[in-house]
């Protein structure tokens, strides 16, 4: 792999450094940060002097990092600006500004909104709105030049899904009635989503953004409860807040189940597109599918368990009803399917992934007939996994094992 020290947009960075240092007395001797000279890893056969290759390498550095370096993002944006100015005077450079260039430019602008949101207080996020607008403008230029680009469609979906919570939902109350057309924005994002084989990790991130958005919508109005310690994944769950039909989130809230189905189907398609079955991306996607299946199993599981075990004061056995049998069957099917994906997601180096399988085995055991051989088998599998995980982590998951042993 070729590596070189990268100094993108040096003049722009020098200007920015002077502006920033001005608040400290305008010193010209400011200490350079590590982002001024970054080691960029380029693919085999890539010209290390190619400016677009450098730009792509820098973006990947940011994309695969902790994403806490606003200065690096500004460097990417400044370099994109410089290349555009150069392209206005250099026909050869103009030809090189491909769809990936426009994608990187738009992505960098949209990522900067995260930092701008942290800077802006109150209910108006003017900088956030401005940067999202600039990102979409840049994307429209790219799509005009490259109308068949799937990468630009994917980036458009990402920007929309990032914008809905960051610019709009954060300021909403339960009684809000603003006309924000959020449902249409979500539908536009789904319509433009496409799996790009050269950017599978970005494809995965876009789907994760939708997953996060649906979770936000489900928990909307319960933010204070969650802050006080009620987990949105608690066993008893929390009821959806009833919104007026005029509320900006009403339509999205009404279609949460359908959107989860679309999301799971898209994750399935993404998993099939990943050729490296032992990659972390494959395991992450498989885990996401497994978790969505467990989530779908929650309602029928709750129905079954409440009918069969709901009356703690009644010592007599409860006869299964048609409703409980149907709920039990559906919950079992979904949980067994979830287990298949969670087993694919296991990482031999990460005991947490083993424990996730064990917990799903416990869920399955709870859905099997009381004290049946199948139930005992499910619990035993979970116990074996938990003992292995505890041994590897010096008892980190002992509390889960203790709870399981109380069942037996």
Curated annotation (Swiss-Prot):
Biased composition regions of type Acidic residues, renumbered to the chain: 311-321
Species of provenance: Vanderwaltozyma polyspora (strain ATCC 22028 / DSM 70294 / BCRC 21397 / CBS 2163 / NBRC 10782 / NRRL Y-8283 / UCD 57-17) (Kluyveromyces polysporus)
Region Disordered, annotated ranges: 1-33, 311-330
Positions in coiled-coil regions: none
Biological function: Required for correct translation termination and probably involved in regulation of hypoxic gene expression.
Keywords: Nucleus, Transcription, Transcription regulation, Translation regulation
GO CC, one annotated term: nucleus
Subcellular location: Nucleus
The keyword Transcription regulation appears for this protein: yes
GO annotation, biological process: positive regulation of SREBP signaling pathway; regulation of translation; translational termination
Name of the protein: Enhancer of translation termination 1
């Amino acid at each position: 792999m070729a590596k070189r020290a990268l100094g993108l947009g040096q003049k722009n960075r020098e200007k920015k450094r002077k502006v920033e240092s001005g608040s400290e007395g305008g010193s010209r001797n400011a200490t350079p940060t590590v982002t001024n000279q970054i080691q960029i890893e380029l693919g085999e056969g890539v010209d290390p002097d190619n400016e677009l290759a450098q730009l792509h390498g820098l973006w990947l550095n940011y994309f695969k990092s902790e994403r806490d370096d606003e200065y690096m993002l500004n460097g990417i944006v400044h370099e994109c600006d410089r290349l555009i100015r150069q392209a206005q005077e250099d026909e050869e450079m103009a030809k090189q500004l491909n769809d990936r260039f426009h994608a990187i430019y738009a992505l960098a602008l949209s990522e900067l909104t995260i930092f701008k949101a942290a800077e802006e207080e109150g209910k108006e996020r003017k900088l956030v709105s401005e940067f999202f607008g600039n990102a979409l403008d840049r994307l429209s230029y790219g799509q005009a030049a490259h109308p068949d680009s799937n990468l630009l469609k994917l980036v458009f979906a990402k920007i929309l899904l990032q914008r809905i919570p960051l610019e709009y939902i954060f300021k909403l109350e339960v009684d809000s009635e603003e006309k924000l057309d959020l449902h249409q924005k979500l539908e536009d994002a789904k319509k433009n989503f496409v799996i790009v084989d050269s950017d599978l990790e970005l494809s995965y991130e876009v789907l994760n953004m939708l997953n996060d958005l649906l979770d936000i919508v489900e928990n909307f109005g319960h933010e204070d409860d969650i802050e006080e310690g009620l987990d949105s994944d608690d066993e008893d769950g929390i009821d959806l807040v009833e919104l007026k039909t005029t509320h900006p989130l009403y339509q999205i809230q009404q279609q949460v189940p359908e959107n989860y189905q679309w999301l799971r189907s898209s994750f399935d398609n993404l998993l099939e597109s990943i050729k490296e079955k032992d990659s972390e991306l494959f395991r992450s996607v498989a885990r996401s599918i497994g978790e969505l299946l467990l989530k779908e199993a929650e309602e029928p599981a709750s129905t079954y368990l409440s009918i069969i075990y709901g009356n703690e004061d009644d010592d007599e056995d409860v006869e299964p009803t048609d409703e409980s049998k149907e709920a039990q069957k559906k919950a079992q099917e979904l949980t067994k399917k979830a287990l298949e994906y969670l087993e694919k997601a296991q990482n031999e180096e990460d005991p947490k992934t083993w424990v996730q399988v064990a917990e799903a085995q416990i869920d399955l055991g709870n859905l099997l007939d009381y004290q049946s051989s199948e139930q005992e088998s499910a619990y035993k599998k979970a116990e074996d996994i938990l003992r292995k995980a505890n041994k590897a982590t010096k008892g980190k998951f002992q509390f889960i094992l203790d709870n399981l042993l109380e069942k037996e």
